[in-house]
From Swiss-Prot:
UniProt keyword annotations, A-Z: Transferase
Assigned protein family: Belongs to the GST superfamily. Phi family.
Regions crossing the membrane: none
Catalytic activity entry: RX + glutathione = an S-substituted glutathione + a halide anion + H(+)
Protein name (Swiss-Prot/TrEMBL): Glutathione S-transferase 2
Length: 38
């Protein structure tokens, strides 16, 4: 059971991290677009 939990936790972390990175990158991209259009 412990190993299964470890695998599940690491999967969850991977998904969470990639989602946070996606959101962060899209926000950063929008900010850069606004900054460059000036």
């Amino acid at each position: 059971l412990g190993k299964l939990l470890d695998v599940y936790e690491s999967r969850l972390l991977d998904v969470y991290e990639s989602r946070v990175l996606d959101i962060y990158e899209s926000r950063l991209g929008k900010v850069l677009d606004i900054y460059e259009s000036r």
